[in-house]
Amino acid sequence: NDGVYIGVTATPARLDLNNTFQNENHKWVFFQPHSEYKGQDFFFPIESQGNVFAVDYNLYFLKDESHNPSKELRDSIYRYLVNSTNLNLFVNQKIKNYVMLIHTSVKMENHTGDKKVTNDLFSELAQKKGPKFLRHMEQIYNFALKKTEDEEKAKKICKFIATNADKHQIGVLNSDRNNKLGFDLKKFSEEPSSLFTISIGGNIISRGITFNNLISMFFTRGVKGLMQQDTYIQRARMFGNRGKDANHFELTITESIYKQWFSCFLLHRLSYLSAKNNLHQVWLEGSRTRAVAPSSIDKSYVRVDKGEISFSKI
């Protein structure tokens, strides 16, 4: 009864609104992130250039309604191959094994479909001949030329990929028992063991797993209703420490999901400021986002107000 509980959280809203362990928010201590950590200010910056988000990495928007999701995934894999190869040939002092993360759905049957698209592509590349191989190489050359604007570099990138395409591994990270048999998670996350490493998954990958050398992310997992800030703030931890590769990172995502995710962090910033400046914590929600799940709120402890807020020019 005389003990003191000290907790650490990345999602203070849920802790506070849930009244977890009779939380005393006036005693909170706020820690600064590590200097190498790339967080909300890097991936979801407030700054814009006209109507475009002013990001310092490669942000590739998809249409909300896809008529050919398999092609979108293949194109993203092509760009990943080109991007990682470009770094290994023309930037890095030594070869690095880069990871691409594919997160399209929480449903495990969809992970099987994503794996088939990925398997087929790499299997056809590994054959090093035939019409399918040539079609892949043509697409890869086009992406390489667009990226480098240099025909010789584009040809070298294609040659490297054609030679090394068999140095790949594809893993599905979910709760399916068959996928866990003999599966070494570190090889697909913290310590990628193959030149081209593809990690596919659902909830498991967004629960605090660290992905080192993550250079590409294909994210199309939307939400049916409102996006929960606590869930998507936690999910963003997979971005993590990008180091010197940060500006070469590519996020492929639908524009609507990105904007919802951006709104989560924008409202979180405002709420965080109220807490950090010794004001009574106010956890803000938007028209398409909510702070936490309604079931997580201790209604005897929390007052909910609804209305509109206006601001003068800042």
Where are these predicted regions, by residue range?
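Conserved P-loop NTPase catalytic core
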Residues: 1-90, 99
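Short glycine-/polar-rich loops that comprise or flank the Walker A/P-loop
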Residues: 2-3, 24-28, 97, 212-215, ...
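Short helix/loop capping segments that flank catalytic or ligand/cofactor-binding pockets
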Residues: 15-17, 39-42, 110-112, 181, ...
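Short secondary-structure boundary/capping segments
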Residues: 18-31, 44-50, 114-122, 215-218, ...
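C-terminal helicase lobe and adjacent C-terminal extensions/tails of nucleic-acid helicase motors
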Residues: 53-138, 142, 239-249, 253-314
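Conserved RecA-like P-loop NTPase helicase motor core
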Residues: 178-259
